[in-house]
Amino acid sequence: MTDITKLCDRAYYVFDFRVLEKRVAYLRDLLGTKADIAYAIKANPFLVEGLRNQVERLEICSPGESEICDSLGIDPRMTVISGVNKTPAFIEKLVKNTDGRIYTVESLTQFELLAALAEKYGKRLKVLLRLTNDSQFGINEEDIESIIENRERYPQLDFRGLQFFSGTQKTSLKKLKRELVHLDELLLRLEEQYGYRSPELEYGTGFPVAYFGEDLEEEALITGFRQLLEEMRWQGHITLELGRSIAASCGSYFTHVADKKRNHGQNYLILDGGMHQMIYFGQYMGMKQPKVALCGKEDRQPTDQWNLFGSLCSMNDILVKALPLPEVEIGDTLRFYNTGAYCVTEGMALFLSRDLPAVYLIDSEGNLILARRTMETFPLNTPNQEI
């Protein structure tokens, strides 16, 4: 098999679908058969192909993500259209040309838009009412109750239920319980006061990933969460929206040592990547140490500590501080683990007009696929001379 540590002479990513499939199977085993899984594409769009047969739904949060799914031939009936800024043109295009999608309602404006478009095109649209978590997302309980109370005015809408998501990296079972209890009470109130039995709840769990060696009892957390679902008085179809928890472990980021130096007693490695290409959630000025390996020298003992900086002309472009490494040379390759979620897309990609890293995929059969070549960004930052 190809040595994935030597695929490119510049920084690059590798996402392994085999690891991805094992991760989904592991989560399903812990969660049981009660819940379906929706993958949030924003975590990593390069994984859509690897997950299309592994999850029940794909969560789309932008027109660009919709285009990605269309280019891959994803069945529209598998998609949920979410996001706070659903432009009329984007939603009308979807309503006019496709059937079977689910649309989230993030505001009363979106609600009226969906109702109007459904009537215009003679379609019955599936909608999920998103409950706010006291942020810019979703609508209040009072708005949800008003919509449900007056639902007969909107026969063109199929009210599928509620959606809720409050954030990522949740390590507290107590917090998850508080949210589910609140949702349980609202779902029961809708039934008791308005005669509406919600068919479905879509819930974003925000399960955490241990990027920096944290003591995370994941199995206990997820099995405890499963018990909370089973204790809900409302009983209906549950879909769990997952992104980071599914994707993180399948990814590795490879970057090369471009230079090395010692300044006033501190060792520095300059890498051909940096924070414009790779960033961990919770990483701040390299203060936390993710799992990193010096490729080909994993079995050697550390000989010194090194500060790992990227290629940007910025004091902030530090990936790791005081990382113990074996003897390291210019040209060596470093591998950053658990980079499958968000790392590839959250960096400041256009800063200093540096390159976008290549992306490789390993499919379920072990075949290596070049999903994106190294791309220069300077054309995007070059002023257009048109008048």
Summary of predicted features, one role per range:
Residues 20, 42, 62, 94, ...:
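Conserved, mostly hydrophobic/aromatic
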Residues 1-105, 111-125, 154, 158, ...:
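A charged N-terminal "starter" segment
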Residues 126-132:
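ATP-grasp fold ATP-binding core
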Residues 237-387:
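Charged (often Lys/Glu-rich) extended helix/loop segments that serve as interaction or gating elements
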Residues 60, 81, 105, 129, ...:
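Conserved beta-strand positions
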Residues 45-47, 67, 168-172, 207-211, ...:
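Flexible loop/turn segments at secondary-structure boundaries
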Residues 14-21, 45, 60-63, 88, ...:
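Electropositive phosphate-/nucleotide-binding environments in soluble metabolic enzymes
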Residues 117, 133-264, 351-354:
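Active-site loop/helix belt of alpha/beta enzymes
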